[in-house]
């Protein structure tokens, strides 16, 4: 069993993170964010940067630099017209920082994606009949969803140090779980719904 697992992992090694590509991208699929509002966009969607303490500013800069290295964010030049900006904040958990976009304003205009999300009790009921269970986790799963050029313009974040464009799906967008579930059901069409 161990040798078979190693052989499968080696055969599909391009599907796993590496030093050369620490964050993968779902190939052949782009996420399109559609808003239920006409241009020019309301001022509500042009949020200013939130005030931040020196500690939070340092953490924001660190988070932004990490996401830029991973190809999740890019700096928006000063000559680019920016119609939508979402402020970001830093949250702390066990002295570790995480940057979070305040997408509440954008989400009010986001057309909901009603793709079904499995309920945990149904999943656990299906799994209870199985003898072996395999668990897989994606590093920064939402960030593996590439955004369309149109969506990138809607998902620009603003901080004290500049304006940045999301190239991948950020956390906090209303439809992110639905998009991700659709991808998982496409990759594993029967395994997620039937067990086994």
Give residue spans per PLM region:
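Reverse-transcribing Pol proteins
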Residues: 1-114, 162, 195-196
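Conserved catalytic palm subdomain of right-hand nucleotidyl-transferase polymerases, strongest
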Residues: 94-107, 119, 123-144
